[in-house]
Amino acid sequence: MSWLLKKWQNFIVLAPLASLAFASLSGALFSASVWWALGLLGLALLLSRPDWKWRMLVVCLVVCVAWRTEVIESRVGKSHGQSGSEFVEGTLTLGRVDAVFESQRSGRLEMNSGEVRKVMVMRASEYRAGEILEVRGKLFSPGILRNPDEFSMLDYWKNKSIERGLSIVVAESRGLRWQSAPVRWAERLKLRLQEGVSAGLENDLVGQSVIQAMVLGEKPPADSEISVAFRESGAMHVFAVSGLHVTLVGAIAWMVLMNLPVPRRVGVVVVLLAMVSYAMVTGARPPAVRATLMATCFLGAFVLRRRPSLFNALALSFVLAVIWDPTQVKQIGFQLSYGVLMAIGAGVGVAYRFTGKFAEVDSFFPLRLLDVWQQRWLAVRRYFAALGATSIVAWLGSFPFMLWHFGIVTPISVLASLALIPLTTVILGLAFAGSFLGVFWPELGMLSNRLNGAIARTAYYTADGFASVPMGHWKARRGSGTDWVVFDPADGGAASYLDVGGGVMIDVGSEKFYRYTLRSILRKWGAEVSMLALSHPDGDHVGGAHLLMQQGDLRKAIIPTMKARSPSYRDFISGAEDHGCKILVGTRGKRYQLGGDVWLEVIREGLSEDRGIADNRIMVMRVHWKGWRVLLLGDLGLEDELALLEGEYDLAADVILLGRHHHGNSINMPFLKVTGAKAVITSAANYPPFEKPPQNWIQTMERNGIEIFNQTETGAVLMDFGENDLELRAFLKEEKKLILER
């Protein structure tokens, strides 16, 4: 016990600022959870020096950060609480390009009414940082989430303290702010670097993509083979610009300065300037900014002739970051940055006791007797021993965050980092060298870039190899939390996910819906879709099918017809064989097993002849789930509805899913009486008008005892199937719920 107390006292002496870090965290969380805040305040007081002045500083810091958090959150929350949009006029001062959505810029809008708003400006790539504009435009807030686990632009803006979005209608330039000159310089330099690091790599798309991502943060699409390889090898911290890259840039600068007659303190300042410049050039991404701040706090001790302390430097950077913006403590990247560095600081010494055995030398052997090559080999072993220890504790530190937020576990990343971090260092160094040489000697610059391209390809193949190692990574499948999710694309399209078998989709929505909404939802769930059924070749229903297929998990697709005019539909069919997806044209009466006691039945085949529009070629399907029947009608029209009534079709159903026919006539009361359905889920959109269910149609259905789930009001609809009951729930309206019983 006395040993533990002594360690505690030593930690307080070595890292007195740790108490202030916990105090600032307490203040940032006060509005979210009082109990967590009080617990952290108690820990801060325990870690503080036994001095009433120090403890008073802790309490004051908690109060100040809590007040600042409340001011920021209340202002942003009040602004986003305003529904709809409004036209405004005023003076707009533009900020930097957004790190994720590069066509957008932050800005400060001073409206003619006297109000001031921090805004995100849409389609602002043509403007410059610090540009002052007289504008007329539309202020708006992002729409509410209509589907479970959908990416929230509203939360993204809140985390950046953005109050509203701004679409500019008319703009007139009034000049530039001189204070923003460094940002403009960084943006121009980034454009030059993009050209410089890619010169001579026009025919090497893999090498070019890897270099652009590692050096400038210009990542390829998330579903590309390159991104998947680095993600599944646990090496995204190497692939995307992060704090690691800022650190490596500082290390490269220091290696150059070691060969020059530069005093140590001056060298440290130059290293910090290099890190700050790199962070700005890459868009001041939060991980890069945090790493630069941490490095400044740590290396600043050398400039001030003080003994550096890792924990003290981390604590100081944490306090400064939280005071600047308390809301960022809720961001995943912020938690990862400090969590990993805390783990490294606490555990790297322990880990090195094991990895350091690789670099051990007999303690009785004089090192001065080693020749040059033996000394170099020893230095290499020590480097990899230290890197291995760091990789182990970094992975352990990131493990809970990655599992909780992303549902992926990548133990192979420990080994992957040993190979990829040295390669990344070389790629960064050659990229800067190639860009510099290209200014004076273009041919030599291109030669350097081609060499770099070969190394970048090696990095990709290395990551791909580690990603292929059995049990090197696995996804903790969290699922949708419900049996059937009827998504709301809000554009008149349709998409459903059935959590059965290897995962089943019935329609996938438009390409836009899949790319910007559905893909991220499925990835968050850890869902691997192995089977797909398509109702008809309408772009709003099948537009994302070829993108889903490119994920590589799709093994079977049931389609209405082999021929259609839809380009996305044709792309899907033509690429199926290359992606290992078996195409089956739905056959009337045939049952397709989905998994367990769930199967799909084709009621009516899709029509092969072209009848003008895709809505006239519907394949009518029915899903049987534990004895419950769900009839899928797609955008069935009046003509086909009458044909089904006149034909010998079994249309019995408990629930019906339907859309709106292009000509506006979809499903009437006689048809519904034949089915015996008790609930109808209808897709909807405000535009075009025919996609919106008529109010008189809804009233007629409800008067006849049919529960309508109008997705304009409900958003997504969730269904859970039991042996004796079937529950339907609206995502947007928690109070709207229906339970069907046998």
Predicted regions and their residues:
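Membrane-interface helix/helix-cap signal primarily in integral membrane proteins
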Residues: 2-6, 62-237, 474, 516-520, ...
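Core dinuclear metal-dependent hydrolase active-site scaffold
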Residues: 219, 322-330, 463-531, 577-652, ...
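Active-site metal-binding motif and surrounding structural segment of the metallo-beta-lactamase
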Residues: 501-504, 512-564, 646-664, 676-681
